[in-house]
Amino acid sequence: LNAGSVLIYPEAFSAKERSVYLSGEAVFEVTHNDELPFMVNTSDLTIRVHGTTFNVNAYPESRNTSATLCEGSISATLKNNGESILMIPEERLSYDRETGKSTISRVNPSEDTAWKRGDMCFRSENIHAIVKAIERKYGINTYVTSGKYDDMILTAKFVQGETMEQMLGAICKLVPGMKYSIVNGCVYIR
């Protein structure tokens, strides 16, 4: 279970299914059982597990909800239209909450599960999503005070042991003119 995440599950599963609710991000390793299917529910997706390892990213403040299949198989049902998508390993289903559209892409699952190792991987991510992930990891408030970065897309990898200051410094080196300051425990990016 990643930082800032909540997993809700019953004290005992029903006789028909094993169902949990996730807000945030988690990796699941599930043993297949035809008689007792495992379901992960988010605000946007219901994921039915067919025996597998997969990552779900469903932070409520994020624009996208995603499911990345590491091994095995899952089917994901979009709650907005009922469409069900059967996924194969190394696929990521991304659902855009603003447009209501979903996409499937081929990915390296180890990047999406990097957080389990203490690493952070971002591939073509919006600066606001990257800053929010740093905020969750370090439990601090962050503010991007300039609108000129709203459409900024970056690719970066940070390894376990790098400090928040090292991460922010690296981002500022990637973006000409970007600076950050820490005031009263809050990070301001301008």
Question: What residue spans do the PLM features occupy?
Answer:
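A residue-level detector for the "anchor" residue at the start of short, highly conserved motifs
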Residues: 2-190
